C-alpha cells in the first residue's frame, strides 16, 4: 500500500496504492489495532496478536472463526462494482459472525478512472448500505487515494461519508523517506487537513502508521521509503495521537513484507514500540 502507480495482487484481490502520481503519550486512544498482510502462519495461527494487534486482516470465514478471544476481523472485499453477485458471494458468509468488525471495501479506489479502473461513489454507497442493512453494526472502511502530492495532498472529488456512506477512512501519509534524510512529520498534519477539507471528519479517520521501509517501493519525490527508527515511530504515533485522539481502530502498514520491504514481522525494535502503544490504548 505505499504510494506509487503500482498494483499488487493479494489473495486474489487487486491492491492499488496510495498516490495517483507516481515520556509523552504515544498514539491514539483506541481499543482496536490492525496490521495488514501476513497475519497467519502456515498452521493458521494469528501472529500480530503477540504484540497487541487485536484486529486481524482476514480473507476467509475459517480465519475469522479461528481468531483468539478478544480479536476481531476486518474482511477484505476489493470490488467496487456495487451489490452484484460477486459482492454478495463475498460478504454474505460473514454476516452474523461474532468475530466480525467490518469490511475493508477498497484500498485507494480511483474516483476518476485516470490511474486505475474508476470506482464510483454510488457503488461504494450501495455496498455500504447493504452491509448496514444486513450486517447491523458492521463497519465499512476504505483507504483514500491521494489525488495530489505528499507536499500538497488532496482528496477533492474523492469519497467522504456523504457521497459513499462509508463509515471509516484511512490515507497513506508515510513521512520517512530517503530524499528527506529523515521524516517529514508535518506530512501527517497536511493529510489530515486535506481529508477534513474534503468532507471526512476526524471522527471518521483511521490513523495509518508507516511501519515498513526499503524494497521496490518508490515515493512521489523520487526516493524510497525508510523503516522508521524507534524514535521516529514514536513521533509518528504521537503526531497522530494529537490529531485524532480517538478512533474506531488504528492501522500499521504493515505486519508482513511486500515487494521485498522490511516490515513489522522482522523488526523487533518496532514490535516493542507497537506492543507498548497497543497495550496502553
Protein language model regions, located:
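N-terminal secretory signal peptides that target proteins for export/translocation
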Residues: 1-8
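Glycan-processing catalytic domains of CAZymes
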Residues: 25-281
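Bacterial N-terminal signal peptides
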Residues: 10-20
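Extracellular cell-wall/glycan-interacting regions and their flexible linkers
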Residues: 1, 14, 23-27
Amino acid at each position: 500500500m505505499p504510494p506509487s502507480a503500482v498494483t499488487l495482487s493479494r489473495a486474489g484481490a487487486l491492491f492499488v496504492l496510495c498516490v495517483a502520481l507516481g515520556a509523552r503519550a504515544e498514539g491514539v486512544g483506541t481499543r482496536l489495532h490492525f496490521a495488514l498482510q501476513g497475519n497467519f502462519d502456515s498452521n493458521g495461527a494469528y501472529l500480530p496478536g503477540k504484540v497487541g494487534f487485536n484486529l486481524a486482516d482476514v480473507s476467509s470465514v475459517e480465519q475469522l472463526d479461528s481468531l483468539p478471544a478478544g480479536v476481531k476481523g476486518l474482511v477484505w472485499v476489493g470490488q467496487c462494482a456495487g451489490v452484484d453477485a460477486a459482492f454478495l458471494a463475498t460478504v454474505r458468509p460473514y454476516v452474523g459472525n461474532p468475530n466480525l468488525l467490518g469490511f475493508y471495501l477498497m484500498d485507494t479506489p480511483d474516483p476518476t478512472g485516470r490511474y486505475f479502473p474508476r470506482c464510483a461513489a454510488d457503488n461504494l454507497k450501495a455496498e455500504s448500505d447493504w452491509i448496514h442493512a444486513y450486517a447491523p453494526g458492521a463497519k465499512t472502511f476504505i483507504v483514500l487515494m491521494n489525488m495530489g502530492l505528499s507536499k500538497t495532498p488532496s482528496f477533492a472529488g474523492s469519497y467522504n461519508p456523504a457521497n459513499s456512506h462509508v463509515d471509516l477512512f484511512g490515507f497513506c501519509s508515510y513521512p520517512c523517506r530517503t530524499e528527506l534524510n529523515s521524516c517529514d512529520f508535518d506530512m501527517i498534519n497536511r493529510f489530515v487537513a486535506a481529508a477534513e477539507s474534503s468532507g471526512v471528519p476526524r471522527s471518521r479517520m483511521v490513523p495509518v502508521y508507516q511501519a515498513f521501509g526499503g524494497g521496490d517501493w518508490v515515493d512521489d519525490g523520487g526516493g524510497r521509503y525508510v523503516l522508521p527508527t524507534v524514535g521516529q515511530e514514536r513521533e509518528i504515533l504521537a503526531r497522530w495521537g494529537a490529531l485524532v485522539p480517538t478512533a474506531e481502530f488504528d492501522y500499521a502498514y504493515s505486519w508482513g513484507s511486500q515487494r521485498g520491504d522490511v516490515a513489522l514481522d522482522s523488526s523487533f525494535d518496532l514490535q516493542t514500540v507497537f506492543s507498548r502503544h497497543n497495550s496502553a490504548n
